[in-house]
C-alpha cells in the first residue's frame, strides 16, 4: 500500500483501520472506469471512436448507445472490427455489421466497395443503414434486431421471431439462438450473444483511456 501511494504511516505489519482504508482506496482506484472510453475502444482507432459517438448521437440513441453499437459490431465482426471480414457461412455478407449484397445495393454500394473501405469509412454506411430506425434504437436488443430482424425493433423481449411450428425452415436456420430449445426463438434469446459481447467489451482490458 505504501509503494502504491495509499499509506504513508509507519509500517508495522498489523492490519488496522488505516490499512483497511488504504486498501479500499486502492481497490476503488483500480476498479474506477470513469477514465475509460466506450466498450471495445481498445480495438479501434480514436477516429473510429469519435465517429461512433457522433453516429449514435445522430441516431438519437441514449448515452449507452456507443457501447451498444460497438458490442453489435464486435459480435458481427468476430471482435475484429474489420471492414473486410466475410461471413464464414458463405452468405456474401461483409464488414462491421455484415452487410448482405442486397443491403449494400439498397445503400447505393456493393459489398466489394464496402470491403475496400477503411473501418472508419465504412461507418458512414453503418449510419446510413440505421437511419430509418432513428429514435427507435433504445436498447441493446433493439439495436441488434435492427441488424438481424428489423421487424422486432421496439417489440417486447419475449417477442417470437422464429417459430418452429409456423416457419420450420427459418427456425432451423436460426435454431442456434433458441437457448431453451422450446421451438421458439425470442428477441431476448437472440440478443443474449450480443449482451455477452457488451459485458466483455466493458472490461477495462478492452477499453482505451479517454484522451
PLM regions: where:
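Short acidic, glycine/serine/threonine-rich helix-capping segments at coil-helix boundaries
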Residues: 2-36, 87-90, 111-115
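Short, flexible helical or helix-coil boundary motifs
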Residues: 8, 30, 59, 198-201
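General N-terminal targeting signals
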Residues: 23-24, 160, 164, 202
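Intrinsically disordered, low-complexity segments enriched in small/polar residues
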Residues: 1, 5, 21, 157-160, ...
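Acidic, glycine-anchored loop motifs typical of Ca2+
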Residues: 10-13, 17-18, 113-115, 168-209
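Catalytic glycan-binding domains that act on GlcNAc-containing polysaccharides
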Residues: 34-178
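Generic alpha-helical secondary-structure signal
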Residues: 22-26, 125, 146, 193
Amino acid at each position: 500500500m505504501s509503494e502504491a501511494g495509499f499509506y504513508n504511516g509507519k509500517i508495522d505489519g498489523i492490519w488496522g483501520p488505516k490499512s483497511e482504508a488504504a486498501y479500499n482506496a486502492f481497490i476503488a482506484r483500480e476498479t474506477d472506469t470513469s477514465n475509460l472510453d466506450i466498450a471495445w475502444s481498445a480495438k479501434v482507432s480514436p477516429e473510429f471512436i469519435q465517429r461512433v459517438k457522433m453516429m449514435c448521437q445522430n441516431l438519437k440513441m441514449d448515452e449507452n448507445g456507443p457501447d451498444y453499437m460497438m458490442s453489435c459490431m464486435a459480435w458481427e465482426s468476430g471482435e475484429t472490427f474489420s471492414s473486410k471480414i466475410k461471413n464464414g457461412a458463405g452468405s456474401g455478407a461483409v464488414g462491421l455489421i455484415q452487410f448482405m449484397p442486397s443491403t449494400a445495393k439498397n445503400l447505393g454500394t456493393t459489398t466489394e466497395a464496402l470491403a475496400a473501405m477503411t473501418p472508419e469509412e465504412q461507418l458512414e454506411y453503418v449510419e446510413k443503414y440505421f437511419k430509418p430506425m432513428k429514435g427507435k434504437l433504445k436498447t441493446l436488443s433493439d439495436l441488434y434486431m435492427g441488424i438481424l430482424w428489423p421487424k422486432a425493433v421496439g417489440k417486447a423481449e419475449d417477442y417470437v421471431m422464429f417459430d418452429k411450428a409456423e416457419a420450420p425452415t427459418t427456425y432451423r436456420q436460426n435454431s442456434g439462438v433458441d437457448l431453451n430449445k422450446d421451438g421458439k426463438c425470442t428477441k431476448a434469446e437472440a440478443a443474449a450473444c450480443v449482451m455477452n459481447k457488451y459485458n466483455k467489451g466493458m472490461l477495462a482490458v478492452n477499453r482505451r483511456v479517454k484522451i
